[in-house]
A protein has these predicted regions:
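Specific aromatic-rich, kink-prone transmembrane helix
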Residues: 139, 144-146, 159-177, 183-191, ...
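Lumenal/periplasmic acceptor-binding loop at the mouth of the active site in multi-pass
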Residues: 266-367, 374, 498-502
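Short periplasmic/luminal acceptor-recognition loop of GT-C membrane glycosyltransferases, typified by
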Residues: 282-283, 287-293, 455-456, 466-504, ...
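Transmembrane-helix motifs of polytopic, lipid-linked glycan transferases
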Residues: 91-126, 166
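Membrane-embedded, lumen/periplasm-facing catalytic core of multi-pass transferases
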Residues: 247, 259, 424-485
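Extracytoplasmic catalytic/substrate-binding loops of multi-pass membrane glycan-assembly enzymes
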Residues: 32-46, 57-74, 83-87, 248-255, ...
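Membrane-interface transmembrane helices that cradle and orient dolichyl/undecaprenyl
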Residues: 7, 126-131, 167-183, 194, ...
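Short acidic/glycine- and proline-prone juxtamembrane loop motifs at membrane-interface regions
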Residues: 38, 63, 149-160
Length: 559
């Protein structure tokens, strides 16, 4: 039987204003943001190839397909020029953020229903609680604090937030309103889409399904409902896994976990692994080393992309094996624990205000009991923290899971009834929202300024290269390739060889005769120019041309 809950709707307009305010702030930050961060270029390449008719382009061992398809669709529909491409990328990111806001709205409405239910079941029904306005205001302040600075990040993390909030909200819906085959089927469907968004959702899907099942053990048809969820999940995941396995020549659900563990825990290089670490395996098809001092690597074929070594690292790292080493793992856990503590410290306002609100209940036993009773709300977050903690942690990976954790904490706020309880809750809520708003505003201004500066530089480089005759589709070579350099994508370049960052000073220290030898080697790769994103102030730049007023220089390999 579903629970019967009396929810007080004392300000329906407030719940409408909050998402519109969030969407407006998201639009502001999107329009002045940096379009190309981290792994963005690889996702954009995948989407472009997919909508050019190569559907197998999304069968990538590292990057999941859904985010690439979303961006590929917008670029295929609008076909932006170079000048408008960053704007289109950011508008696409913005619409992903809108989906996250809507998913959070659904999730938070279910959290509020749960909070009201728990409050009504208190042995002292007159206990003081959040009003509806306070609960929603606090919730959106947390949401914006966690997510607003990620709007411009062209990675699938915001899209995954949409899936996480929708799935968590649906679990609460099942808990509060009763299980049905349709709700479990939708949950399985969402989790399958989550896997197509980021591979980490494959193990996390187990946790979400476990939360849905174990929180509804009294349901008579529970096994049937679970089967409906599993069928939906398999229906989404299986075709992709089948085709990916065919593409890679062996069964695989993706290589993200293996590659990240090898990079972060085993010390394998992110690019140009040559099998130099013997216990990690033998390189099956590494990038080709053309020169030893400085090191030069060529990768014109068979993988395409703006920067092929990062378009599909699973190909170039074929033969790589991960090794579990207890010492390395313990060091990684300590390092990642420090990362979590640093992220928590940035949330000191939340910690302080929630700690005061919960501590005012005075008795620790009911607090622990109540927190454990909403395990289905915080368990997926703890599981995500544990999974990332084993391998690698970045804030953008875990922002949505912090929100789930704080949602569970806010359900504990039920103070003993006395004259000052309501005023205490209201005062602390106002202080928390006010301080979080200041931090949100500060982050918004910083993101707008830094994002606009970075986006302008990328555009200046791309347009400067075009002005100097470097055409779209042209093959180029690089000194110190930047994995997140959007100017390469904007200029439609194809990087075929590079001198890595750590070899930069070696190259610039060479005499003219030796450098001419390097130029001849690079020319044989098919690259028309050598591009140096930065040149040391002491380095000779004879025969090099500066790209406008940017720090980039080019050298023509084929005069």
């Amino acid at each position: 039987m579903p629970y019967q809950i009396a929810v007080t709707n004392n300000s329906p307009r407030f719940k409408i204003v909050l998402p519109f305010l969030s969407i407006s702030l998201g639009l502001i930050i999107a329009l002045c943001g940096d379009s190309f961060k981290s792994d963005s270029v690889s996702y954009l390449d995948m989407g472009d190839y997919f909508f050019q008719g190569d559907w197998r382009a999304i069968l990538n061992g590292l990057w999941s397909p859904l985010f690439a398809i979303v961006h590929g669709l917008s670029r295929w529909l609008f076909k932006p020029t170079m000048r408008w491409e960053p704007t289109l990328v950011q508008l696409t990111n913005f619409f992903v953020f809108v989906s996250t806001v809507l998913a959070f709205q659904f999730f938070w409405s279910e959290v509020f229903r749960l909070y009201r239910l728990l409050s009504q079941r208190e042995p002292q029904p007159s206990s003081s609680c959040f009003s509806e306005n306070e609960f929603w205001g606090f919730g959106y302040a947390i949401f914006l604090f966690m997510h607003l600075n990620l709007v411009t990040c062209t990675t699938p993390d915001m899209l995954l937030s949409t899936i996480v909030y929708s799935s968590a909200g649906l679990i609460l819906k099942i808990k509060l309103s009763g299980a049905t085959s349709l709700r479990f089927w939708l949950l399985g469907l969402l989790l399958g889409v989550g896997f197509l968004t980021k591979a980490v959702m494959l193990p996390l899907a187990t946790v979400f399904l476990m939360a849905a099942v174990l929180s509804n053990l009294r349901q008579r048809l529970l096994l049937f409902y679970l089967l409906a969820a599993l069928v939906a999940f398999a229906g989404v995941v299986s075709p992709y896994v089948y085709e990916l396995s065919r593409e890679k020549g062996h069964f695989t659900t993706g290589e993200a976990a293996k590659l990240n563990y090898a990079w972060h825990e085993n010390g394998a290089p992110f690019t140009h692994w040559q099998g130099e670490i013997a216990h990690l395996g033998k390189a099956e098809h590494p990038t080709r080393k053309l020169f030893s001092s400085p090191l030069i690597y060529e990768f014109a074929r068979p993988v395409r992309g703006t920067y092929p070594p990062w378009y599909d690292p699973s190909y170039w790292n074929g033969g790589l094996r991960v090794q579990f080493e207890l010492g390395n793992q313990l060091r990684a856990l300590v390092k990642h624990l420090n990362t979590y503590l640093r992220d928590l410290w940035s949330q000191n306002v939340l910690i302080a205000c929630c700690l005061v609100l919960v501590a005012l209940r005075q008795d620790i036993r009911p607090i622990l009991h109540d927190f454990l009773s909403v395990w289905y709300l915080w368990l997926p977050a703890v599981a995500a923290f544990a999974l990332y903690g084993l391998v690698w942690v970045e804030y953008r990976y875990i922002a949505q899971f912090f929100v789930l954790f704080w949602a569970a904490v806010l359900t504990l706020v039920r103070l003993p009834a006395h004259n000052h309880s309501r005023r205490t809750i209201r005062a602390i809520t106002i202080v928390a929202v006010f301080l979080l708003t200041i931090q949100i505003g500060t982050n918004l201004v910083r993101e707008c300024i830094d994002g606009h500066r970075a986006a302008s530089l990328q555009m200046d480089i791309a347009e400067g290269l075009a002005a100097q005759g470097v055409r779209p589709g042209e093959r180029v070579t690089l000194i110190d390739a930047d994995l997140g350099a959007g100017w390469q994508k904007l200029a439609r370049l194809v990087v075929v060889a590079e001198i890595p960052f750590e070899e930069r000073e070696t190259f610039w220290s060479l005499d003219i005769a030796k450098r001419n030898e390097i130029y001849q080697v690079l020319a044989k790769t098919g690259g028309s120019v050598l591009i140096a994103p930065e040149v040391p102030h002491w380095a000779p730049t004879t025969s090099w041309q500066r790209v406008g007023s940017t720090p980039v220089y080019i050298y023509r390999l084929h005069p």
